[in-house]
Amino acid sequence: MSVAEIEEGVFEATVTIDNGSFGTRAIRFETGRLALQAAGAVVAYLDADNMLLSATTASKNPKEQFDFFPLTVDVEERMYAAGRIPGSFFRREGRPSTDAILTCRLIDRPLRPSFVDGLRNEIQVVVTILSVDPNDLYDVLAINAASASTQLGGLPFSGPIGGVRVALIDGTWVAFPTVEQLERAVFDMVIAGRIVGTDDEGKPDVAIMMVEAEATENVIELVECGAQAPTESIVAQGLEVAKPFIAALCTAQQELADVVSSRQAKPPVEYPTFPDYGDDVYYSVASMATDELAAALTIGAKLERDQRTNEIKTQVLERLAGTYEGREKELGAAFRSLTKKLVRQRILTNHFRIDGRGITDIRALSAEVAVVPRAHGSALFERGETQILGVTTLDMVKMAQQIDSLGPETSKRYMHHYNFPPFSTGETGRVGSPKRREIGHGALAERALVPVLPSVEEFPYAIRQVSEALGSNGSTSMGSVCASTLALLNAGVPLKAPVAGIAMGLVSDDVEFDGGTERRFVTLTDILGAEDAFGDMDFKCAGTKDFVTALQLDTKLDGIPSQVLAGALAQAKDARLTILEVMAEAIDRPDEMSPYAPRVITIKVPVDKIGEVIGPKGKVINAITEETGAQISIEDDGTVFVGATDGLSAQAAINKINAIANPQLPTVGERFLGTVVKITEFGAFVSLLPGRDGLVHISKLGKGKRIAKVEDVVNVGDKLRVEIADIEKRGKISLVLVADDDSATVPAAPADAGAAQEFGSGTAPADAATASS
């Protein structure tokens, strides 16, 4: 690995990823050619066809009035990157896609904690996707590019950060897998980290900062065929496998930054920091509030505890306001810091948590289904003060979401939406379009459930799952997984296995012990909101009783020992099994489908008959829809989805489709109750079967009497009882009216049919359709 100057002022560093029999990938960082006015800019390449530009800029003056770090990450997808014109009305890119938003979050999560505390200059990282191979994913490359451009920007940043995707394929962990290779994977992980020193062997010591992982869509089928299931130990193994790749990527970025800084001397920029509080403020707050606050933090109920701590805070602010006039923000920050210290100390020394639980205890659990009357499926899941309502809606497959982004996915049959209204935390705030956090939480719950969903052949429905966070005090995203499993089963969705989720936390610090100090790690099961805020790790894990389906980890520490992480995974599994037992008491198998849910039936028609079923400008299929009330969707392979609110309407539509696609030719002598569809000077055309008409000549309409005009006897829309008198070689059918005294032999026409055949030849064969109800 080395840095090369490919032309004057343009430098590049390359990392080669060797996956053995799975091939090699080349990641290249280039700077000095594009976006030269940014504080730092890098063009990152993955092999030859994937190219993106990351530019990092910083405001010249700090925003002293802010009490947070103003970092913004934006990912700009350009449709030209895939050789496409945007599908929007204006034919240009608009609001970011879900893929772009999720990539922003992947970048932000490891980047934000790597900046120095107290920085108040606005920092913006913009990643523009310039070229992408449809067989590759750009998100992990974007993490590395954002880190590299930030490292080059001369900012107070403790990077660089390396990101890698590893997938378990045929028992081997493969780095930077292609989309094609991922189809054979059982587990897929995006991992970001940084080098924090060297280990005992002198190799780079990598601290994992962020993990986003999921089982793949076809994991169960692959495991049944002999593939390794993604158990907790396998997941921990994957985290270790990723570390050498992360080290190589970080080293390349650092070497590039070192060479550029030595060749292109820029005047150093000073970025002032603004500590949240001064030591004098903290000492005064601690002296005044420690005892009362420690007692308040033993109150188990969240609302009562918050009320008491707010009372103490108000008293402290009032008593110290005169002493620290103009530094009120510091007083509030110092009070929060004291709260954090007390909570962490009690956990580390006494294993005593805010609400009185032990470190592995789960709060009270409650599960209930069928709580929303007309919903196709619904459930209410409660864990302590966290309350999630899950609602399932089923519809035709054609209602799947169409995706216009640079990702490989063009449509999504299962859509999971998460809502987090402000009242869930007892606050006021904006409601409306989802924020990035809501999109991210919905995506996490979706990834947890996709591996257990039935295939479209097994369950021909589009599924929309909505998670309403009605109460929040710790991990509404994992509560959403539990509520969604319950609601899906209540809707009659045949899940391959139920899924539950749990949020874990970690507190670590040096604790005095036997006259010395030791580094102590305490893993917490089912963390509260305060434990999430004051802890060192947010670790969410979802899965079945047998394996992990989704995992998300963020940590503020410079590395978590492998045995601590393995213990957290095992602890999470114990909690997951407990929750699954409670869920099974509410519902342990799919319910009957709601009477309000559509009934969808699938049939197959020959591909060369698709055009006949649709008809010119959709005339035939629209007529069937209008007559039967069913919704019809036809795929390119001849699969037809027929949906209706009742089975009779769906079957009537299927009969009509089969009459066109799998016709049984009428014979001379057969009788029908048909509808007049066209009138000419020489007779009336009568519809016998969908797509098949016959002619009653004008001479046959008068019942032996001569008539001058066809309209004197019949009009379009009239029903006639007719018999086939002749069928010409070219297929033309001649009809005669059935005498009134013979009409009893002709069966009455069904209300939903254009024509009824006397011998029922329009009925679909019993094995021609598969019903899902």
Curated annotation (Swiss-Prot):
Region (Disordered): 749-773
Protease keyword on record: no
Places the protein is found: Cytoplasm
UniProt-recorded name of the protein: Polyribonucleotide nucleotidyltransferase
Entry's Gene Ontology cellular component terms: cytosol
Domain annotation KH: ranges: 598-657
Catalysis: reaction(s): RNA(n+1) + phosphate = RNA(n) + a ribonucleoside 5'-diphosphate
EC identifiers of the protein: 2.7.7.8
UniProt xrefs under InterPro entries: ExoRNase_PH_dom1, ExoRNase_PH_dom2_sf, GPSI/PNP, KH_dom, KH_dom_type_1, KH_dom_type_1_sf, NA-bd_OB-fold, PNPase
Pfam family name, one: S1
CDD domains linked: KH-I_PNPase, RNase_PH_PNPase_2, S1_PNPase
Key words, A-Z: Cytoplasm, Magnesium, Metal-binding, Nucleotidyltransferase, RNA-binding, Transferase
